[in-house]
Amino acid sequence: MAVFRSGLLVLTTPLATLAARLPPILTSASRLVNHTLYVHLQPGMNLGGPAQPQASPVQATFEVLDFITHLYTGADLHRHLDVRILLTNIQTKSTFLPVLSSVQNLAHPPEVVLTDFQTLDGSQYNPVKQQLERYATSCYSCSPQLASVLLYPDYGTGELPLEPPNALLPSTIRPASPVARSPRQPVRGYHRGAVGGTFDRLHNAHKVLLSVACVLAQEQLVVGVADKDLLKSKLLPELLQPYAERVEHLTEFLVDIKPSLTFELVPLLDPYGPAGSDPTLEFLVVSEETYRGGMAVNRFRLENGKEELALYQIQLLKDQSHNENEEDKVSSSSFRQRILGNLLQPPNERPELPSGLYVLGLTGISGSGKSSVAQRLKNLGAYIIDSDHLGHRAYAPGGPAYQPVVEAFGTDILHKDGTINRKVLGSRVFGNKKQMKILTDIVWPVIAKLAREEMDVAVAKGKTLCVIDAAMLLEAGWQSMVHEVWTVVIPETEAVRRIVERDGLSEAAAQSRLQSQMSGQQLVEQSNVVLSTLWESHVTQSQVEKAWNLLQKRLPKAYQTRN
């Protein structure tokens, strides 16, 4: 059967039974849709009757909110799908507006409409499919060539799961009030509320948080998006999507799921954000991790003469397929870890480089573990050009940079044997931009020339892939000599610790060295592949092997034969 880029799944089974049926339904849908899957909840709708069914309100209860959580949890097993539960017809007890009084536009118009509704004979019965298509197009903007499919998932026994009438989903949404509530208790609606987060690489746990907030809000939802100082403590912050990109993805998702709301997306620059200062807000949705932060917001509000917000706590979604060193919850940190070793942007064509030689530039801040990665690549078959080694050749007496450097910085930078004391020279230039530029204007062109000569040596030895290991690769402009830039990143605090331990410098001297270099963020912005040595050695090895294997797949055969 054809695979569609976008689809609409209309769920008609009563909630009490639907929860147990979700896994096979999602599996069936994932075989037909390969990108965006919208979900419309209409329990009890009959597509087999004489009358054309119409959209009707679904009472927002805690059971419905729990179901939303369970659906997104199940969707996490199908990572190729961008699942979006549509909320226009899910309404709180305080507001019953006309449901879908006009056709709702969707960012990705469905090409196919699917349903769990089944005919008695298990066929693709045309009148039912026609009713389904009419229902879908009366509610949402769909593709003109809309197809329809009645799903018949394998439920094991072939029968609906039998559950006692009081069998309810476990609670995943908790109001801050200690008062016990029934899962079928209606949810209160509020005029304005707030939710906050980093929202990097929007995932299903984010979608639960945002969806609950959208159900509770009747007029406006304020969304705080973490930026600047609040990002510094994040794992692999260099791989965070830019603020504008995160806001763009958030906006599309929010407008898709509940266009009747007004959304205000603002930078979150401190732990309180708008929730701490806006007197018109009534509720705040938090996760288990941020619940204490929500309590702190309420204390801050009380201290400043504002009413407390109603807090709604969402349980964390368990990541059922997390890897080693990843969190056991669905998180953006794990998504960023999975990017390590992947190609982030296309390689560069370098026709001026030696024919038949593919060149990687390996860089990273001091202490990043770049040289250990170079050794791992060497073990896999790469020819390594060590820029530090070339620098030693350039600085050596009689070397191409020796005399110009001595003339520029004086003979007091020399050892008694006439060799350049690089520690003394380094103390002159680190932290002094003018002196550093004088040195680099001399040395960088010399090392670049030596590197090109080494490329010719690699070709003569029959090598087809070489790596230029250079901390200053991008500062020196040597990216023009490579097809791909690979960057090794670690937190600056870890880099300082390693430099102090390795080189015997003070923390201040180590920080000064790092400040004279491009930041990890600046390096990543110009990189094709990113790696990290933050974890155990075997984790680094797995990353490097992953990156190497992906490289082999995208290399032309001419570059693969002699390594």
Swiss-Prot record:
Q: Where is this region: Phosphopantetheine adenylyltransferase?
A: 179-357
- Give the modified residues of type N6-succinyllysine: 461
The modified positions for Phosphoserine read 177, 182
- Cite the InterPro entries for this sequence: Cyt_trans-like, Depp_CoAkinase, P-loop_NTPase, Rossmann-like_a/b/a_fold
Primary location recorded for the protein, binned into one broad class: cytoplasm
Query: In its keyword annotation, does this UniProt entry include Oxidoreductase?
Result: no
Pfam family of the protein (one): CTP_transf_like
Q: Which residues form the DPCK domain?
A: 359-562
The family line of this record is: In the central section; belongs to the eukaryotic CoaD family.
Identify this protein by name: Bifunctional coenzyme A synthase
Per the UniProt record, the source organism is: Mus musculus
